Amino acid sequence: LKGKVKLGAGVKLLGNNYIAGDVGPVVIGARTIVYPFACIGYEPQDFKFIGTGLKSAGVVIGTDCLIREHATIHAASHDAPSPPTTIGNKVFLMVSTHIAHDCLIGNNVVLVNGAGVAGHSVLEDNVTLGGNAVIHQFCRIGRMVMMSGDCAVSLDVPPFCMVNERNRIGGLNTVGLRRGGMPREQITELRRAFRDLLRDPMPRARVISEMTERGRSCEPVAEMARFIAASKRGICPGMGKGLRGSRMNASKDGEGMGMDSED
């Protein structure tokens, strides 16, 4: 340990841990367990930090987290008052996982061995990344998303979905929704919305409008609509046949939608 490191009550460091609070402060919440050879708080993989002595807003880790061997969590790329790299509560980072600078990781997130999240990305609550899954920088991954092993995304993934190919949504995470206690009626409405609006290319404005209308009677559908409306990178498309050969760039009119943006 070096520099400004604050450990909450009951934190366990199991030996050969490397925690650097000299680049920026590191705060680790109560009852978190850090396994051997995990590295936390070192400078980001950014050329501007090489030999310059720049300071960072650091790292904040929540309570009851498990950080396994060789996991890495890098400090933010900007100093305070910019936010630190942030890990929520009850996050499980398995062996050799990576959280890059300026990421915001929600609660109850799981990264399986070898998964990596690039800088400035956001993972909302209850996201699971399979082994060796990778997230491009600045991406947003919605609540209760599950990514299969060896997948990669460079576009945003709406809440409640499953990713089973590169930048492709295979369907809803129905098993996760049931385990999370979502009522059957809401799951049914989500499935209808996904089937009707996300499987094939459709104008972004129409998707948001129709999904918002359906969301009046189903909050999870409304949550998905808000996520899509806020997207700046574009949305991973579904597995509909109409997607073959299509380009997923967002235009000015359809910014934030990985679908056709013209009527």
Label each PLM-derived region with a short phrase.
Residues 1-168:
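Structural signal for interior beta-strand "rungs" in well-ordered beta-sheet cores
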Residues 31, 37, 42-58, 64, ...:
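Terminal amphipathic alpha-helical/low-complexity segments used for targeting or macromolecular assembly
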